Amino acid sequence: MVAKQKKLSLEEKSREILGILTMVVGFFVLLSLVSHEPTEELSIMPGVHFHNWMGYIGIFISYVLFKMFIGWASLVIAVLIVVWGYTIFAEKDIQPVFRFTGYSFSLSLIGITLFGLIAGQSGMPNDEVFRHAGYLTLNITKLLKDFLGFPGSIMVLGATLIVLVQA
């Protein structure tokens, strides 16, 4: 006997397609970040060999997320895109994913900012901190250090981390 197959409505098909596409984008971003090469810039010149597995689009994604945004903590963004894609595809409850997204992104931002503060304080050159933590993080750490000093910045970030974990 052949089991009857349930016909999917257009809305269900659209949701599944959106979920799959979101997961594909998440994996694309993840592979772009994993294969990030710090020396690759956003120029497309003939004859230049690129190292990013995802080509020129991967270079652009890794440039924006690594160099301009939050460095290695950008990997969390790629994972969150995949999680959102799965949630959409599997028609799971969105509320826990919102909470997970907020916690994950906040923890990664606080963590990379702590890294930037400690690395800068320990004498690591700004270009090295920039290479690992990104431009946004470098500016956040500079702002915190200018207004609060190193100990004050550590205290504020530590308190924020404790409040975040306790919530």
Question: What do these predicted ranges mean?
Answer:
Residues 1-167:
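Alpha-helical transmembrane segments used as membrane anchors
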